[in-house]
Amino acid sequence: ESTTDAEDKNVSVNDTEEKEHIVVTDSIGRNVEIPYPVTKAVVANAYNTEIINAVGALDCVVGVDYNIYQDKESWKNRFTEDMVIGKSQKDLNYEKIIELQPEVLILTGNGTWEEAEKQLEPFGIKVIVCNAYYTNEFEKSCDILGKVFAREEKAEELKKYFMEKLDYIQNQLKDVPKKRVYFEYRTEGNTTVPGDFFYYMVEYSGADNIFKNASAVQVESEAVVEANPEYIIKVSASDVYSSYYPPTQEEHKAIKEEIMSRPGWDEIDAVKNDNILLLSHYVHGGASKLVGTMYIAKFLYPEQLSELHPETVFRDWLEEFQKLDYIEGHTYPEFSFED
């Protein structure tokens, strides 16, 4: 009998005390001591989950927020209702998290991480902030999540894939006059300004954001007409369901027609010259929105970026990094693999 006891005891000791511990510096500079590698995590925010998937650690995820759970197409139904840890990173169910017994909770900086820390500390569950929605923090997010799950090599591969393309864009556009762009997210007048979630997606494409000096994301229609952008980039519309399955051609067309028919917008160069690019909500967000950056860059500077093929990038993101089949139709106009 004593042997069995010892063995049982041994198993539990190995799971906890004897696991190596490391310190990870998270997105907001907190130093968090965690078991290494983490094998049980609960995660809020799809940007984080996508990178965890891309580094090959999705099997370690034992709980997700409702937004992730309900997007069944993007996650191939792998998350069940009993894995839901709350509506979003801002609305967490701590009882559920404790019940799932993860080693860490990973959430974004706009989530309730301070509250989470307070609630989960007594149960030994560590809280890691990872801001994978910020394009300019993509490398840092890869480093954090690669380290947490001991998938450093895969994280390096993921970083390299996208950073090489970003460097190419930067080098090719060094002396090129910037094209003036109006970016709109979902609803009319909702643009991007410094500090906002979409700012660097647009910035890294080499665009001159017409509202780069504005302080509020909501802008008046007249201000857009007055600024007269050469290009308009829009991420979907709020009434279009967005997931791995793209909007229909009809939905894309309706979004474009709505833009073109706004009062006074027929005066805008982008509308006159039909320089309007629509990105689905799903496609713009890949790899901390760097997939979105690739499409915007190519749309603005096709001659200078002959070796950048955003549709191929999107296919690689799906097939290699998300383990999903490639699907077309996420942009309007559509890009071929050669474009």
Stretches with model-predicted labels:
Residues 32-34, 49-54, 69-74, 189-194, ...:
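Short, solvent-exposed loop/turn elements at domain surfaces
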Residues 192-267:
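Flexible, glycine-rich surface segments
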Residues 1-36:
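Short, low-complexity disordered leader/linker segments with a strong preference
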Residues 31-35, 77-85, 204-214:
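A local structural motif
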Residues 27-29, 83-95, 214-221:
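Short helix-initiation/N-cap motifs at beta->coil->alpha
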Residues 40-44, 62-65, 86, 104-108, ...:
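Structural recognition of the beta-strand scaffold that forms the well-ordered cores
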Residues 43-100, 104-110:
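A short, structured surface patch at a secondary-structure boundary
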Residues 17-21, 31, 115-190, 208-212, ...:
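Extracytoplasmic substrate-binding proteins
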